[in-house]
């Protein structure tokens, strides 16, 4: 581990606190980025399975599933890696021990893990480029693919489709999930925990690409 103390700085990050963590069995370094205010936590505990995670506070204001769609969309190509499905390519070629992205009621996280150092650095670079320079900003078709669009069935009747739409349609067909979401709605009527962060199929089509970009 690099020798960092509470006066150290590296790559624009300044150290705020260094402490031992019994729960994590190692040293924890808490830092902040001077220009952006981004917070960084670095844990050194001798674990050979290296883990990186970039996380964002994402507080929904409705049940359109905007952050769930965003989670999917940023992993559909970026400035440095303009392939259609970099996530799938990584799954096929990487030695990753964990590779995923998850949307919660109040945050979205993009974690990767690998025991191979070069593979770990590659995964980290791909994920950072995905979240900070995604192709979705220039290509609305990614939104329609991952969020929602309209197709015609064999009789010419319109049908809603989309990766997230279909996923949440399946999830919300479960009675337990419906009861759970209704319970949250009653318990938290005035904050983010009352909304369906994954997206309610009844409301996902309310989201436009223009609203998504905001």
Residues covered by each model-derived region:
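Short structured motifs
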Residues: 38-39, 94-96, 211
């Amino acid at each position: 581990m690099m020798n960092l103390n509470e006066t150290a700085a590296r790559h624009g990050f300044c150290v705020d606190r260094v402490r031992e963590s019994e729960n994590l069995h190692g040293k924890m370094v808490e830092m902040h980025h001077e220009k952006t205010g981004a917070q960084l936590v670095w844990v050194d505990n001798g674990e050979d399975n290296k883990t990186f995670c970039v996380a964002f506070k994402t507080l929904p204001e409705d049940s359109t599933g905007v952050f769930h769609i965003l989670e999917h969309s940023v992993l559909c190509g970026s400035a440095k890696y303009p392939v259609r499905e970099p996530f799938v390519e990584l799954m096929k070629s990487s030695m990753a021990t964990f590779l995923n992205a998850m949307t919660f009621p109040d945050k979205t996280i993009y974690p990767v893990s690998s025991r191979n150092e070069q593979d770990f650095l590659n995964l980290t670079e791909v994920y950072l480029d995905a979240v900070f320079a995604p192709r979705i900003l220039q290509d609305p078709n990614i939104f329609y693919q991952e969020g929602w669009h309209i197709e015609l069935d064999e009789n010419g009747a319109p049908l809603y489709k989309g990766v997230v739409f279909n996923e949440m349609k399946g999830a919300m067909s479960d009675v337990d999930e419906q009861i759970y979401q209704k319970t949250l709605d009653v318990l938290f009527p005035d904050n983010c925990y009352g909304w369906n962060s994954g997206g309610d199929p009844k409301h996902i089509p309310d989201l436009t690409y223009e609203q998504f970009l905001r």
